[in-house]
Structure formats: structure tokens, C-alpha cells
Amino acid sequence: MIIKFIQIIKPGIIFGNIISTIGGFLLASQGDINVNLFIFTISATAILIASASIFNNCIDKDIDIKMQRTKNRAIAIGLISSNIAYIYALILLILSFLLFLKTNFLTIFISMLGFFIYVFIYSLLMKRKSVYSTIIGSLSGATPPIIGYCSVKEHFDIGAFILLCIFSFWQIPHSYAIGLVRYNDYKIASIPIFPIKKGSFKTKINIIIYIIAFFISTIMLFFAGYTGNNYLFFSIFFGLIWIFIAIKGFKSSEENFNIIWGRKIFLFSIVIITAISILISIDYKKNI
């Protein structure tokens, strides 16, 4: 049973977001790391994401049971009651907030705003109704690196804005690719994702547009003076590979091809965002 309580906080998602949070923190620190601040920021962010994940599972339990990918989730099948899950999530939210008090007001505001957007605006209000819910959700998905960055800087500057662009633009092709791979799941659950409402061709066009926007944003971090030459080289290298993979999506519109292609877009999205997070952690410019 303990394993089920661990599973509903989605450890994989926490891990991925913590990598980007560390990236933002180290980019802002420029080698001068406040260890206590680092521990509080990373811990608070991880716990906040865990809380948001549980709230999301509770809200989505009726649609999770319909989808092949999510039908065995503990809350969906009743192994963990919604009331217990909500209490669990609320305790984690309070604990996260208390840890964030060790940072600064801006970091607290950004973290709580990201939580609010994900749980209330995306999960509760838009996911079942709007084809553009992914775009709204991308804003909350982009908050972890900004939390890490602003916990150090204590202000929202051009660096934070570029991070917002990078991680927001990344979220959309990442999510649309999942939509193509799990198209039938979302259709059965009546979730109006972009691939279902707009079709595969428009989805592929949008994936390319957002990948290019992501690519430009990653480069801007260099030209704004935040990162070094190694970052520029590898961000261009990985970015061009992702664009190349995306362009190949127009070879066919068959469902099986879309699933295979969507999986490639999805998998490489994880590779590239991990690479970017690591690069901003180690190849930063000082005195920015």
C-alpha cells in the first residue's frame, strides 16, 4: 500500500522537474551556491509537485479509469479514497509552503501561481473543455526552473523570462506528441486535445512551430549573456535534431506512422530538455 502512496505523487515527473529546478538555481547562482537555500528550494518544489499530482489524480479519476495508460491508478480504482488523497495532498501543499518561506516572496508567488494554474485552471476547468488547455498548462509546467532561478536572484529578469519561454514552448510539442501516441485513449475519455479536435496535420504544424520557438528561445539565453559557447553549440545541435525529427512527420498521415513519429518526438523532448537543464547548470556566465 505504501508503494501506491508513492506512485500517486508521480516520482518520474518530480525527478524531471527537479532537474530543471536545479538548472535554474545553478544558472542564477553562477558558482556561488547557497547550500541551505538550495535544499529548501529543491525540497519545497518536489513536495509541491507531489501535491499537485495527487490533486490532479483526484480530479481526473473518472477519466483515468477509461484510459489504458491510467486505468490502474490507485485513486481511479479506489485503492486510495479521494478523501484520503485530498488530505495527503493538502498536507504536502502546506509542508511545501512552509519550506518556501525560507526562500523569498517572489519564489513563493511563482510556486503558488504555478500550482493554482495546474490544479484549478488546467485540471479542473480547462482540460475537459478546451483544445487550448495544453497552452495554459505549459505555463505551470515552466515554473520549476523559474522557481530555482528566482530563489537565488530574488527578482524576475530577462533570464527568468527566457527560461519561461524555453520551458513553456517545450511543453507543447511534448504534450501534443503524447496526444498522438495516446490518441485513442483521449478520444475514449472525451478529452478535447489538439490532435483530436484539429487533426494530425495541424498538430504536426503546431509541433514544428513550437519546436522552432523553443529552439530560438534556447539560443537567446546565450545571446542575452547567460550561458557560454558550449551551451550554444549543444543547444543548436540538439535543437536541429528535434526539428529534423519533426519535419519527417509529414511523410505520412497514417495512424501507425503518427504513433511511431509521436513517440520519437516525445522521447527526444525528454532528451533535449534534460540536456538544456544540465547545460545551464554547468556552462553559465558570471556577473550577469
From Swiss-Prot:
<dbReference type="InterPro" id="IPR000537">
    <property type="entry name" value="UbiA_prenyltransferase"/>
</dbReference>
<keyword id="KW-0472">Membrane</keyword>
<keyword id="KW-0812">Transmembrane</keyword>
<keyword id="KW-0350">Heme biosynthesis</keyword>
<feature type="transmembrane region" description="Helical">
    <location>
        <begin position="161"/>
        <end position="181"/>
    </location>
</feature>
<comment type="pathway">
    <text>Porphyrin-containing compound metabolism; heme O biosynthesis; heme O from protoheme: step 1/1.</text>
</comment>
<dbReference type="InterPro" id="IPR044878">
    <property type="entry name" value="UbiA_sf"/>
</dbReference>
<feature type="transmembrane region" description="Helical">
    <location>
        <begin position="265"/>
        <end position="285"/>
    </location>
</feature>
<feature type="transmembrane region" description="Helical">
    <location>
        <begin position="205"/>
        <end position="225"/>
    </location>
</feature>
<dbReference type="InterPro" id="IPR006369">
    <property type="entry name" value="Protohaem_IX_farnesylTrfase"/>
</dbReference>
<comment type="function">
    <text>Converts heme B (protoheme IX) to heme O by substitution of the vinyl group on carbon 2 of heme B porphyrin ring with a hydroxyethyl farnesyl side group.</text>
</comment>
<feature type="transmembrane region" description="Helical">
    <location>
        <begin position="35"/>
        <end position="55"/>
    </location>
</feature>
<dbReference type="GO" id="GO:0005886">
    <property type="term" value="C:plasma membrane"/>
</dbReference>
<protein>
    <recommendedName>
        <fullName>Protoheme IX farnesyltransferase</fullName>
        <ecNumber>2.5.1.141</ecNumber>
    </recommendedName>
</protein>
<comment type="similarity">
    <text>Belongs to the UbiA prenyltransferase family. Protoheme IX farnesyltransferase subfamily.</text>
</comment>
<dbReference type="GO" id="GO:0048034">
    <property type="term" value="P:heme O biosynthetic process"/>
</dbReference>
<feature type="transmembrane region" description="Helical">
    <location>
        <begin position="8"/>
        <end position="28"/>
    </location>
</feature>
<dbReference type="Pfam" id="PF01040">
    <property type="entry name" value="UbiA"/>
</dbReference>
<feature type="transmembrane region" description="Helical">
    <location>
        <begin position="75"/>
        <end position="95"/>
    </location>
</feature>
<dbReference type="GO" id="GO:0008495">
    <property type="term" value="F:protoheme IX farnesyltransferase activity"/>
</dbReference>
<keyword id="KW-1003">Cell membrane</keyword>
<feature type="transmembrane region" description="Helical">
    <location>
        <begin position="230"/>
        <end position="250"/>
    </location>
</feature>
<keyword id="KW-1133">Transmembrane helix</keyword>
<keyword id="KW-0808">Transferase</keyword>
<dbReference type="InterPro" id="IPR030470">
    <property type="entry name" value="UbiA_prenylTrfase_CS"/>
</dbReference>
<feature type="transmembrane region" description="Helical">
    <location>
        <begin position="105"/>
        <end position="125"/>
    </location>
</feature>
<feature type="transmembrane region" description="Helical">
    <location>
        <begin position="130"/>
        <end position="150"/>
    </location>
</feature>
